[in-house]
Amino acid sequence: DAPRVCAMEYIYFARPDSVIEDVNVHKFRKETGRILATGDDVQADVVIGVPDSSLSAAIGYSEASGLPFETGLVKNRYVGRTFIQPTQEMRDRGVRMKLSPVKEAVEGKSVIMIDDSIVRGTTSRRIVRLLREAGAREIHVRIASPVLKLPCFYGVDISTKEELIGHRMTVEEIREYLEADSLRFMTPEQLRFAAGTAGLCTACFDGSYCTDLYSYSEVLS
């Protein structure tokens, strides 16, 4: 089989100026935002992205929907990426230190909040609460990737399905947990469409693992 690139490289890990398998990451992320906006009939005032990896998708959503893009969250540049912190306590503390809402951008408004992915759900819930505290009237969460529901055996730090909120809950249950007004994800097919000619490993979304799993298959049972 042809080699496949980890989808999370495009979604989360790589810089927007990166080019992987002839596909620019910024262009890919903008396309995911455009796809999310297609057919989305929610009534909203502004589009914001969770910095930094979601900003390109938020711009794409804004362009496709005609809704204005706003800087609704500001990032502390001296705090590392929360997803790759080793413990949940460190991830939670990282969110509190890392992001601040821009009250003037969201107060009294219906907000489309674009995020790149939901892994465990705790980070997204804290961000929704930050926006509520800043006065957002409604928060509609749009995820620029499919529901992440299966572990990765190739290097990404999601080794068990039990830690993944997408494995334990339905989309509606995740929405309730996040305390969001609505929630939508992409499909694996839409993600592959956004990637164009680049072959993606989407195993964590749909179980299409690139190799035989041997003893690791017990983790999925």
Per-region residue spans from a language model:
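PRPP-associated nucleotide enzymes
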Residues: 1-221
